[in-house]
Amino acid sequence: MTRPHMAPPDIPQAHPKALGYLRDDVSGQGWQQDEQAILALATRLGYDLVKTVRMNPDIHDPLHRLLIIVRRLDIAAVITPTLEHIGGPGRICRVCSLITVTPEYNWALAYKPSEEGGR
């Protein structure tokens, strides 16, 4: 009789993937500081920051484009400097969690759009 192979319990688990997101018109000249803040928060929370996406104001429906990337890369959370970059958590939280740097807050996956205004 053969035994099934069992992996040793100390194999490290992969970190959940995060995607940084910022809008150039909101970050302005401070976009590099915003990128660093996103990276620092992702690292502290145990996420693997896959990349940071910067959108300029000329892009039509930037959240739609962001959600395409989120789905393709199987992202667990989008991290953004402030809620102003996203406009509200509703669309993002149908697909993944949304985390803001300032104030630091996490809107979980499956967030209810009726809760748009608060925590």
Per-range role (PLM):
Residues 1-119:
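Short, structured surface patches at the beginning of a domain
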